[in-house]
């Protein structure tokens, strides 16, 4: 059996899809389905069972027997960078992750988890997987950073793979439940469907992000499991592209529209990453040779999926 936490979420459901594609359907999905809209992410996929997140944690603490587990993909967390309830974030993103990590270490189960480029904070270069380059700007980034630091402490003694991925700007299918936290491409497509022009913040031509297609993210996770990879790695394309490139790809798909600029919101000014670009040196050194879709390629594929 394979366990995917956050399996109804964007990245989790795409990992389930990637597992299905290699013939694995013996999947236990763990999630909090309070947001019932997320169920649509798995309706076309095959899983063996579902467990509520709180029940799952209780089972782990109680020492319940889950049978033979081949891997745990831990994608379940609060992913809202705008969430400032520190107690809530530390419970969901740190304490929960520690419980699951120790469960996997105790049973020698390969453990793959979601970290984030938010751990780097507002830097404009050297997105390198080392403590000296990490200075998160928000509580979400700090919760992810702290777990990375915890993993660094236990990695030298681990007898089974422990692998974290610092996800950069992930976009693509199965994110419609995320509301305001969904990708720019998703929101721009919705604006176009309403007959509006795609809207970007003023100055967005200077905002460069490493936009990585979610199916590429899932592929790297599967590769890491199949190859017994340990460590903490950046997961982006290695190339920063502009929000304008995203908007242009959406316009090109729809065959109409032009970019409209709107004022930059004051509440984001000191907490907004204006540049992200994954340094893939470590991932490539670990042996990953796969390619990553460009914004034009990924957005075109995503638009076709959204408008199918």
From Swiss-Prot:
Pathway the protein contributes to: Nucleotide-sugar biosynthesis; ADP-L-glycero-beta-D-manno-heptose biosynthesis; ADP-L-glycero-beta-D-manno-heptose from D-glycero-beta-D-manno-heptose 7-phosphate: step 4/4
Residues annotated to bind NADP(+): 10-11, 31-32, 38, 53, 75-79, 92, 144, 170, 178
GO molecular function annotations of the record: ADP-glyceromanno-heptose 6-epimerase activity; NADP binding
EC number: 5.1.3.20
Pfam families: Epimerase
Binding residue positions for substrate: 169, 180, 187, 201-204, 209, 272
Subunit relationships: Homopentamer.
Domain comment quoted from the record: Contains a large N-terminal NADP-binding domain, and a smaller C-terminal substrate-binding domain.
Family: Belongs to the NAD(P)-dependent epimerase/dehydratase family. HldD subfamily.
HAMAP family: Heptose_epimerase
Name of this protein: ADP-L-glycero-D-manno-heptose-6-epimerase
Taxonomic source organism: Actinobacillus pleuropneumoniae serotype 5b (strain L20)
Gene label: hldD
